[in-house]
């Protein structure tokens, strides 16, 4: 069995723009539906997910948390798919990954909602890039550490995880997965076992 190299979506394979715009668009749509312009301000909060629940309670009434999250993430998925374009793809990284496919299995491990990942990859011409897609279930709050743990139980540890320098790198290292933090989309705050600025350094 070929060893696995795992990759993140936002900040490694793709620019962060479509995810950031979808985030703002989500709050805008809900502000229209609830006729409350103040909802737009929630998009700027660090702890915005508590406001997602608040907005969903106002919109859906007294339903369970899983239903609220599922509705919220479905709307976010639709907004992200609408936003993403081929211009958001880190083309040289894709070329690098394609060169690895003969010797390695490529896994995309992302907290993006599961229903959005295949359409996003299709829109940017990467439907055939990954051997394994490991995504976040629609009804759960996105949690990358849990995804890593579940992935390792099912497939074993990747030989490397390549992602932007955020808390995902910490989770990867804590689980004994060697991490490569990349800075070609944005400068990360967390350094992996290897920290690189451009694709040519891989």
Task: Spell out what each predicted region is.
Residues 110-112:
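Conserved phosphate-coupling serine/threonine residues in phosphotransfer and NTP-handling enzymes
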Residues 12, 19, 114-115, 167, ...:
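Conserved Rossmann-like nucleotide-cofactor binding loop
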């Amino acid at each position: 069995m070929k060893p696995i190299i795992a990759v993140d979506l936002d900040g490694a394979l793709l620019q962060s723009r479509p995810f950031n715009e979808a985030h703002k668009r989500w709050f805008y749509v809900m502000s229209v539906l609830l006729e409350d312009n103040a909802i737009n301000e929630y998009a700027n909060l660090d702890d915005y997910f508590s406001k997602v629940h608040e907005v969903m309670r106002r919109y859906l009434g007294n339903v369970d948390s899983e239903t609220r999250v599922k509705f919220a993430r479905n709307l976010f998925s639709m907004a992200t798919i609408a936003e993403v374009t081929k211009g958001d793809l880190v083309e040289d990284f894709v070329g690098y990954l394609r060169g690895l496919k003969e010797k390695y299995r490529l896994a995309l491990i992302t907290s993006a909602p599961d229903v959005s990942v295949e359409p996003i990859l299709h829109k940017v011409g990467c439907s055939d890039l990954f051997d394994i897609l490991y995504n976040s279930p629609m009804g759960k709050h996105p949690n990358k550490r849990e995804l890593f743990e579940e992935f390792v139980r099912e497939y074993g540890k990747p030989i490397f995880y390549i992602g932007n320098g955020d808390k995902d790198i910490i989770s990867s290292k804590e689980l004994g997965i060697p991490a490569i933090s990349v800075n070609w989309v944005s400068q990360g705050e967390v350094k992996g076992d290897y920290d690189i600025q451009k694709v040519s350094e891989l």
